[in-house]
Every structure is written in C-alpha cells, then in structure tokens.
From Swiss-Prot:
Listed HAMAP family: GMP_synthase
SUPFAM superfamilies referenced in this protein's UniProt entry, alphabetically: Adenine nucleotide alpha hydrolases-like, Class I glutamine amidotransferase-like, GMP synthetase C-terminal dimerisation domain
Pathway(s) per entry: Purine metabolism; GMP biosynthesis; GMP from XMP (L-Gln route): step 1/1
Record-linked CDD domains: GATase1_GMP_Synthase, GMP_synthase_C
Originating gene: guaA
Active site: 93, 179, 181
Protein name per UniProt: GMP synthase [glutamine-hydrolyzing]
Record-annotated membrane-spanning stretches: none
Domain GMPS ATP-PPase, residue spans: 206-403
Record key words, sorted: ATP-binding, Glutamine amidotransferase, GMP biosynthesis, Ligase, Nucleotide-binding, Purine biosynthesis
Organism: Mycobacterium leprae (strain TN)
Primary role: Catalyzes the synthesis of GMP from XMP.
Length: 529
C-alpha cells in the first residue's frame, strides 16, 4: 500500500500565480477564483520582497484590495520594481489604485464613494469584450483612479470611478476598481479568467485532483523511513491527509481515533469500516465516552464545554500516543504528526510567506510540549473543495469525501444545556432522521451543512395523541457557504421539512416541536454554541 498506484506520475510543484494581500477580506477568495480558472495560486503578504517573489518563480501577480488609502501614512506600499520583472500583473480595488499610482496615473478622492452594487459602463478594450456594455459589479472604495498611466487604455467607468478599469495588452498589465472575485459581480470570473488566459497566456491545466501524486511524493520525501501518527476525526480533512500519508509510507502510519461519545449515529462505524477498507491504514480506537461525559457533568456554558472537550481529547490522544511509544514494534519511535491543516488556516496565521509559525486548528494541536513531533501537513496549500477532489482521486468513499463539516466538539455543542447520555441519545436520533431525509431528497450537495440542535433547557407544551406533552424543541439549521466565514440559510422544500418534522416528533418521544433557523451569518454563527 506504500506505492502510488492509480495516481498520475508526480510532476514538479506548479508555478503559482501570487495573490499579494494588502489586507483584503477577499484575498483567499481571489486565490480560490484563480484556481477555479484552473491555474494554481497562493497568497503572500504585501511585505514580501521582490527577491522573495522572484524566488517563487510566479506565472503572474494579482494585487488584492485593502482597507487603506494609497495616500494614508503607513498604507501598504507597492514596490515599483515589481513591474520590472516582466510578469503579467492584475490589480483589484486598492491593488488597482496602487498600481495606477506607481505607474504614473492619478488617484484622488472623488465626491462619490461607491459601496455595494454599482453600475459599470464598458468603454472598450479586451477585458470586458463580449460582455454586457452596462453590467452590475461590487464596489468598495472612497478613492478612485482619475487618470490612467501612459500607455493604458481606459476600459470601463462608473459614477464614482472615472477609470474603473484599464489595460495594456503589450505589457500584460490590467486592473479593475471593482471586485471580480465576489458573486455579486456576475461577470467577474469571466474577467479574471480572461486576464489569466488571454492577457497572461496561462494554460488552464491545474486541478487539485491531478496533484495527488505530487503530494504523495512530497510526504514520502519528508518522512523518509520514519513513523507517523494522525489524529483521525472522521472528517474530510483528517481522512484525506491520512490517506495521502498512508499511500506514501504504508503501515508506518498509525491513525488514532478518539471516540468521545459525542459523534453522530453511525460515525464510529463509518471510520472503522469505510476508511480502513479504502486505505488499509492501521487504526487505534480510544473509547473515552464515559470520561468525557463525567467531565461535562453539570456544565452548561458553551465555552466551558468546548474547553473541557478539548482538554479531554488531548489527554485521550496523549495516552494513546504514549501507549504506542511504549510498543516495542516502534523501535525508532514516532517522529511525525500528521495534521489536516488547510490553506485558509495557513493564510490566517500569517503563514502565507512560508516563514511564519503555522497555527493548528485541529484537536491534537494542543499536545504537551514534551511530546514533540515534526508536523506533516500535506493539505496546507488546498481549500476544502480541493481536498474533496484529492480524496476522490485517492478513491476514498463518497460517504467520507462528501461529508458535511462537523465541529470537533461534536454534539456537545449542539445541545444547548448540560450534556447527558439521555440528551445525546435524543439528539442523535433526531439528527439521524434529518440527515436521512435530506439525503433521500437529494439535497446533500445543495446544503453545505445542516446542524441539528437540541434546546435541552427549553420545553414547550404540545399534544401528542390524546395526551398533553411537554417536550423539547429541535432546531434545523441548513446553510450554504464556501468557507464558513459567511453563510446564507438554505431553502429546503416544504415537503421535506414536513417529513423531517413529522418523523422526529413521531419517532423521538422527547421532542414535540421542530423549528427552522433562517438566520444568515452574520449576524448568527453557524453553530448555536
């Protein structure tokens, strides 16, 4: 199982399009959109030097937006030497203004700021060729480019931006004042793709799936003849990370699965059956449900529950690791710890430069200092949807690859109130019904996540049969999202909701009311606790 059979032969790591982050909330989204155009991309901070950029051997540069004014003291600066590299460059919002200023254009504060949906008028050029002459875009600016640099054609304007887009085909330079990366700009992806493929001349030949072989070889080179462990949660990230490492080093990987008793119905069996069957990985299961329940007894504060669950998880994982280290079969010890860190975590921690310490958002990130491992993070350059693509390339079961996000503390934070064995059983049965009906209705790929919440400290009066009931409410929380930073509530057909409600109130005796949460994020978080 240590070979990479079935995968494409590994190729060199792809040259990236570098997204220079000027403090934009959308920098990661820009990188995602570039990858959706089938070109590999990475985010780097605006403090990255020209020498560092050159060393990365990029295919092109995208300058992100940002909250500052180019005239504000201390505002992020753009090194003019960037334009001496001969690389294609595309500026967005603040990056567009910084680009204009450095190249000799004029940036000024106009009388009209633009925030939100704005009408863009196309004046010519190639960026918007074939697109509507007047189209909606998403703007967020106070300053504006009032004169394009010499040699640039003005491609579009708006009421608050005399120069809302410019381009220079000969130098492969272009930019826009609006945000092409957001869904509120309907033709934005076409504009970005046109720059990448037509202006920059880049091939659309990158996908997450076709780098699975590369990732396997990178892991094999990093671990060599060593042994590794991986904390397996049953989620997509840890499962794909473990599968990659197992493909690279075979039975020198041991996965540890801590069953804290807060899982949904059937999840333990899924991990033990489907994951092991698909990968052949060695799996150690730790039964810790009773320990977790004892620690959570009497606790109702959400943050308190999270801390207790995290602390107990670390202790259970640590105990399993110590048992392994005491096993004589590990003569050389265990040197490596596999984690399912994803690219958003790398960027948010300041790791985009490749030099900063990377935070760990996974449960095993809190291991004591005296248990020192070298980190293996095979997914650290991928987004969630790309991780799923790699998982499919590795032939992981669809039940694992397409699994909806599930919080580390599990059902413990989907019970509003104290966590008890009885309440877990009630929630587990209600959750199982909801998931079953959503799957039957074919909604698994339309709903990003659907938390089912038990309001354990709330009761309401009802009538079940000829008797008065006094049961708990269950909350359904279907949402759609790309990265969990924002989320919209998702419409579910009424007949599906009716079926879920009827089954839960009929089959789960402790529940007599089912309600629907239709709150977006913000203001509401996806999870209730």
């Amino acid at each position: 199982m240590a070979d990479s059979a079935g995968l494409d032969q590994p190729e060199p790591s792809p040259r990236p399009v570098l997204v220079v982050d000027f403090g934009a909330q959308y920098a990661q989204l820009i990188a995602r959109r570039v990858r959706e155009a089938r070109v590999f991309s990475e985010v780097i901070p605006h403090t990255t030097s020209i020498e560092e950029i050159t060393a990365r051997d990029p295919l092109a540069i995208v300058l992100s937006g940002g909250p500052a004014s180019v005239y504000t003291e201390g505002a992020p600066q753009l090194d003019p030497a960037l334009f001496d590299l001969g690389l294609p460059v595309f500026g967005i919002c603040y990056g567009f203004q910084a680009m204009a200023q450095v190249l000799g254009g004029t940036v000024a504060r106009t009388k009209t700021s633009e925030y939100g949906r704005t009408e863009l008028k196309v004046l010519g050029g190639d960026l918007h060729s074939g697109l509507p002459g007047v189209q909606p875009v998403w703007m967020s600016h106070g300053d504006a480019v009032t004169a394009a640099p010499d040699g640039f054609d003005v491609a579009a304007s708006s009421s608050g931006a005399p120069v809302a887009a410019f381009e220079n085909r000969d130098r492969r330079l272009a930019g826009v004042q609006y945000h092409p990366e957001v869904m509120h700009t309907p033709h934005g992806q076409q504009v970005l793709s046109r720059f990448l493929h037509d202006f920059a001349g880049l091939d659309a030949d990158w996908t997450a799936a076709n780098i699975a072989g590369v990732l396997v070889e990178q892991v094999r080179a990093q671990i060599g003849n060593g042994h590794a462990i991986c904390g397996l949660s049953g989620g997509v990230d840890s499962a794909v990370a473990a599968a990659l490492v197992q493909r690279a080093i075979g039975d020198r990987l041991t996965c540890i699965f801590v069953d804290h008793g807060l899982l949904r119905d059937g999840e333990r069996g899924q991990v033990q059956r489907d994951f092991v069957a698909a990968t052949g990985a060695k799996l150690v299961t730790v039964d810790a449900a009773e320990t977790f329940l004892q620690a959570l007894s009497g606790v109702t504060n959400p943050e308190g529950k999270r801390k207790i669950i995290g602390r107990q998880f670390i202790r259970a994982f640590e105990g399993a690791v110590r048992d392994l280290l005491g096993d004589s079969t590990f003569d050389s010890g265990i040197e490596f710890l596999v984690q399912g860190t994803l690219y958003p975590d790398v960027v948010e921690s300041g790791g985009g430069s490749g030099t900063a310490n990377i935070k760990s958002h996974h449960n095993v990130g809190g291991l004591p200092d005296n248990l020192r491992f070298k980190l293996v993070e095979p997914l650290r350059l991928l987004f969630k949807d790309e991780v799923r693509a790699v998982g499919r390339q590795l032939d992981l079961p669809e039940e694992i690859v397409a699994r909806q996000p599930f919080p580390g503390p599990g059902l413990g934070i989907r019970i509003v109130g104290e966590v008890t064995a009885e309440r877990l059983d009630t929630l587990r049965r209600a959750d199982s019904i909801a998931r079953e009906e959503l799957t039957t209705a074919g909604l698994d790929y339309q709903i990003w996540q659907c938390p089912v919440v038990l309001l354990a400290d709330v009761r309401s009066v009802g009538v079940q049969g000829d008797n008065r009931s006094y049961g708990h409410p269950i909350v359904l929380r279907p949402v759609s999202s790309e990265d969990a930073m924002t989320a919209d509530w998702t419409w579910v057909p009424y007949e599906v909701l009716e079926c879920i409600s009827t089954r839960i109130t009929n089959e789960v005796a402790e529940v007599n009311r089912v309600v629907l949460d239709i709150t977006n994020k913000p203001p509401g978080t996806i999870e209730w606790e």
